[in-house]
Each structure stands twice: as C-alpha cells, then as structure tokens.
C-alpha cells in the first residue's frame, strides 16, 4: 500500500480543494510533484532528511512553559526537527529492529488520514489560542482572538480557510475558554477522533513516528478525562517535599504525615 510521490502529491492536491485548503497543503502538493533538475528522479528524494528552524517554535514553547499552558503539539514539532538532526540516527537504524509496515487500503487510509489531520489541526489551534488567552490575561493585552485569526488568513504561511471558522467562533463567544468548546469544532473533534486514533494506532504498530498527532490526541484525552493521575503526583510531592495538596472535600492546603508501609 505504499504511496508514490505522485500519489502523495495528488492526495495533497485533493485535500487542498476542501476544508484543508491552505498555503502549506498547496505547496506540499507541488513539492511531491517536482522533478529534480540536477539528476534523475524527484527532488524530494534528494533533499537531506534533516530540518532547520529559525527559533519561533522554540520561543513559543518556552513562553508556554513559562505561562503554564500545554502546547505539546508545537513542542513536538520542534523536537521532531531537533531529532531529525541527531547524528545517532544512522547507527540506530542499523541496530534497532523495525516492525513491518501494515498493508492498507489506500483510499480508506487517505480519507482517515485527512480526517485525522483536520482533527489534530483543531487541537493545535486550540493549544495556541489557549496560549494567547493566558498571555492576554497575564500581560493585560486584551487580545481580540477573532481578529488574530483573520490576520493570519493572508500574507502568512499558515493562511488557510480553516481560520475563517476560528474567527466565527470567537465572534460568537469572545470569552470562550478553549476553541474545542465551539459548537462547530466540538462536532468535528467528536466525529474525527476515531480516525485520529486509527491513524496513530497504525503508525505506532508500523514504527512510524507521528509525534504531533500523538500529542494532539493526548491533549484532548487529558482535557476530557475525569482523572489524570495528578492526585498521585501531589501525594508524591507532599511525601518527599512537603509541598502540600488540596482536598476534594475541604478548603485550603494540607500536608499529611506520611507513613512508610513497606
């Protein structure tokens, strides 16, 4: 079920006719269709598999850590670029066993991947706009989130029709705590999570890294889960460092006199 470069290009081109229409999807289609002008074959296969970065993603991740906001998908993207430059990759490929890649129905796979990408894209923007919200509160900026989305719709590499939906969402509810709570985006997340889980499962079983997808799914699962194990973390912190904890049944902060049982 392996896709050729032309098939990948055509897939991106189809996606660029619908709700995923964006500058980056469009030029990705062009890149996979481009022939090499210096040698035989396609130019994509001649480009060294190591990505550079100017620092904006790193700055954003650092600011998010400083403000206590989860933007794990942006950080995962930065880490992937860093890992692509790891000089140990070649040695690892020679000694670490790789699983076999599962066979797939190309048409069904492409549709699941399209849905997974759109779903993950919602989560990525939800993370970033949560960072805007926190920064606005922390620094007294009084940001207009709908206007920010509108600004990105032209003259920017992330320009996409998707941004129109974000503008509409914040025009309806400027104080919305998280983008996924908007009626449109919530509906798309609920309908798309199955495809995202399917693509991630297939990638994991095939040994194919999809860190942004994984972090997007973890983000939404952390958001919707009634318990994430943080009570154990607070218990551990109080046990070794007397950092105190809050209770579900009483107000205030508490420290417990922990006993060693084993």
What do the PLM-derived regions correspond to, one by one?
Residues 1-262:
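NAD(P)-dependent dehydrogenase/reductase Rossmann-like domain
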